[in-house]
Curated annotation (Swiss-Prot):
Pfam family membership, one: Methyltransf_4
Region entry Disordered, spans: 1-20
Pathway participation: tRNA modification; N(7)-methylguanine-tRNA biosynthesis
Its job: Catalyzes the formation of N(7)-methylguanine at position 46 (m7G46) in tRNA.
Reaction(s) catalysed by this chain's protein: guanosine(46) in tRNA + S-adenosyl-L-methionine = N(7)-methylguanosine(46) in tRNA + S-adenosyl-L-homocysteine
Polar residues biased stretches: 1-10
PANTHER family: 3-DEOXY-D-MANNO-OCTULOSONIC-ACID TRANSFERASE/TRNA GUANINE-N 7 - -METHYLTRANSFERASE, PENTACOTRIPEPTIDE-REPEAT REGION OF PRORP DOMAIN-CONTAINING PROTEIN
Lineage, opening ranks: Bacteria, Pseudomonadati, Pseudomonadota, Gammaproteobacteria, Pseudomonadales
Species this protein is from: Pseudomonas fluorescens (strain Pf0-1)
Catalytic activity, EC: 2.1.1.33
Name recorded for this polypeptide: tRNA (guanine-N(7)-)-methyltransferase
Binding site for substrate: K150, D182, T219, K220, F221, E222
Coiled-coil blocks: none
């Protein structure tokens, strides 16, 4: 449930090349529940933001200046809703391409009366490139992205050197890239990419993974995995410059 893994070139030729970028997600058709459809019908006009051609003034969007986090691939939105509800003093931006998930999140926003959350329903790389100002995010979260297990599909993984550089450009100095995966080989791969990415510091004492941070909600899927003895690996990297 994550996005493409290469940064588009901003030229007319690049526009054509952008359409050929390898995507890290596959669009899936899915039925909408009544609640999800309600979320889209009633919530989208206010809470879903269009792709812009220039960086968005989120102080104006949210009506305040506050710490700002962005989550790529929020799935059905349970974790993002929980984080937004637990931290009303912060603002959250979620990116997800799958409509049932967007509808579920928006239904939760309406039900809980949240005002500190906005959504993009499109490719996160386009959102980062076109809508997010440089040095503006306090945190970017990437929880349980598709690991694309087969070697021939590794090029589809969102975590690539180009992604690390793009994220670094959008984080403030001191901002955090927080990733989590339930597949240890992908955690090792993330470490390989991030440990050589310039301008970052691994926050793990051992240079590997951090203990599960309290601010990341535990999902039902994760609890089930824990009962089965499956692990989860959290990685945190701080932008130095």
């Amino acid at each position: 449930m994550t996005e493409s893994n290469d940064t588009p070139i901003q030229t007319e030729e690049g526009d054509e090349r952008q359409h050929r970028r390898i995507k890290s997600f596959v669009m899936r058709a899915g039925r909408m529940t009544e609640g999800q459809q309600r979320g889209l019908d009633q919530g989208a006009p206010k809470f879903v933001l269009p792709l812009a051609d220039a960086p968005v003034d989120f102080d104006q969007v949210f009506g305040r200046s506050a710490p700002r986090s962005l989550e790529i691939g929020f799935g059905m939105g349970h974790s993002l809703l929980e984080m937004a509800a637990a931290a009303p003093e912060q603002d959250f931006i979620g990116v997800e391409v799958h409509r049932p998930g967007v509808g579920a999140l928006l239904n939760g926003v309406l039900t809980q009366g949240l005002t500190n959350l906005r959504v993009y329903d499109c490719d996160a790389i386009e959102v980062l490139n076109r809508c997010i100002a440089d040095n503006s995010l306090d945190r970017l979260m990437l929880f349980f992205p598709d690991p694309w297990h087969k070697s021939r599909h590794h090029k589809r993984r969102i975590v690539q050197a180009s992604f690390a550089e793009l994220v670094r450009s959008k984080l403030k100095v001191g901002g955090i890239l927080h990733m989590a995966t339930d597949w240890e080989p992908y955690a090792e791969y993330m470490l390989e990419v991030m440990n050589v990415a310039p301008g970052y510091r691994n926050l793990a004492e051992d240079g590997k993974c951090v203990p599960r941070p309290a601010e990341r909600p535990i999902t039902k899927f994760e609890r089930r995995g824990e009962r089965l003895g499956h692990g989860v690996w959290d990685l945190k990297f701080e932008k130095l410059a």
